[in-house]
Amino acid sequence: MENSMKKKKSFKESEDEELRRGPWTLEEDTLLTNYILHNGEGRWNHVAKCAGLKRTGKSCRLRWLNYLKPDIRRGNLTPQEQLLILELHSKWGNRWSKIAQYLPGRTDNEIKNYWRTRVQKQARQLNIESNSDKFFDAVRSFWVPRLIEKMEQNSSTTTTYCCPQNNNNNSLLLPSQSHDSLSMQKDIDYSGFSNIDGSSSTSTCMSHLTTVPHFMDQSNTNIIDGSMCFHEGNVQEFGGYVPGMEDYMVNSDISMECHVADGYSAYEDVTQDPMWNVDDIWQFRE
């Protein structure tokens, strides 16, 4: 019995020594891609062996999901995606794979990196817990309005966001959480924009949106004809004026672009992020 155990241990150690470590080669990428395209995903240890790769199953899984899978989206997370991550994390915590299911083309690793290098680090800079009510207040008061403003800038020049009302009055604007609809769209579909009341102020109704309660303060919303509307006063420009904070100015010489790309830096100073770069967030510090 003891000899048998020793042989198994020796065989396993020999296998481990043969496994490749370090960066993947083009040849390995090609082998893995061709195998999965012909046979599909499966048990990753089996995939590694059948594809002729001297890699662990875990290494193959991460390589495929994070780099080789054809439908992976590259580049910066959009404001819509950032808003959705904030909302879903408030519901599910660090369940990155589950959150990734609602962001087509984004990987759980990318979402986790965004949370750790942007959100958690900002909470640490404020000296508060990232899952605390105080931090959610900061998110609701400063980050969410700027994300909504960025969404507005990316779509068209509008002054009011609206979405169909459901049972929750306290909510963020979020893409519909229907798996079918989300899997079909790369970004939120804005084709359903229309005016609400026909007045001179422009209103924008986002199609394929739902409401999920958490961040948005009800006092900042109005219900018009069964719709949830977020008005111009609640959506401030980056580097601009924040209602009730007249004594504080945003540092305007910071770039307005929010770079949330593949190359996250653990040493990046997120206080320079225009989403947060407002002097009046001092009130949220401990």
Curated annotation (Swiss-Prot):
Residues 44-68, 96-119 bind DNA. GO terms for cellular component: nucleus. InterPro entries: EOBI/EOBII-like_plant (IPR044676), Homeodomain-like_sf (IPR009057), Myb_dom (IPR017930), SANT/Myb (IPR001005). Keywords: DNA-binding, Gibberellin signaling pathway, Nucleus, Repeat, Repressor, Transcription, Transcription regulation. It comes from the Eukaryota. GO terms for molecular function: DNA-binding transcription factor activity; sequence-specific DNA binding. Gene3D superfamilies: Homeodomain-like. Residues 16-68, 69-123 form the HTH myb-type domain. Pfam families: Myb_DNA-binding. It is found in: Nucleus. Expressed in leaves and flowers. Induction: Slightly induced by salicylic acid. Induced reversibly in response to phosphate (Pi) deficiency but repressed in the presence of Pi, specifically in the leaves. Availability of Pi increases with decreased levels. GO terms for biological process: cellular response to phosphate starvation; gibberellic acid mediated signaling pathway; gibberellin biosynthetic process; negative regulation of DNA-templated transcription; negative regulation of gibberellin biosynthetic process; phosphate ion homeostasis; root morphogenesis. Transcription repressor of phosphate (Pi) starvation-induced genes. Negatively regulates Pi starvation responses via the repression of gibberellic acid (GA) biosynthesis and signaling. Modulates root architecture, phosphatase activity, and Pi uptake and accumulation. This is Transcription factor MYB62. The lineage of its organism: Eukaryota, Viridiplantae, Streptophyta, Embryophyta, Tracheophyta.
